[in-house]
């Protein structure tokens, strides 16, 4: 399944999503930053989707991210590193359930499944 939508994050969403950070001194400012504007939530699927998306995103610290990744090219610092990516399939499933309703996700036959995979390419 796949999906995409604009989301206005609120305190409850962020407290749940970043529950492992609530006691950190930067958490309040992180929440304030993330609630300033809507964010784009995207659900992707595919072979090794979590690992492939994480390659595109880059290291959490933009200074350590490889050139050409989203964080290296577009982020300034760790607290505002521009993008979140799930670290595992299990985490992704929890995050999808947190931010998307079932009717906001779509299942369809991809062209790659129809043509490339049948040919063994």
Regions found by a protein language model. Give the residues of each.
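Non-catalytic terminal and connector segments of soluble metabolic enzymes
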Residues: 1-121
């Amino acid at each position: 399944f796949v999906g995409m939508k604009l989301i206005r994050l609120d305190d409850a969403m962020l407290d749940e999503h970043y529950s492992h950070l609530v006691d950190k001194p930067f958490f309040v400012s992180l929440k304030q930053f993330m609630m300033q504007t809507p964010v784009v939530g995207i659900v992707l699927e595919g072979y090794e989707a979590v690992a492939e998306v994480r390659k595109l995103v880059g290291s959490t610290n933009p200074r350590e991210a490889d050139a050409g990744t989203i964080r290296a090219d577009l982020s300034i610092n760790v607290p505002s590193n521009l993008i979140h990516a799930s670290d595992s399939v299990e985490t992704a499933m929890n995050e999808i359930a947190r931010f998307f309703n079932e009717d906001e996700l779509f299942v369809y036959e991809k062209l790659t499944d129809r043509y490339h995979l049948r040919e063994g390419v």
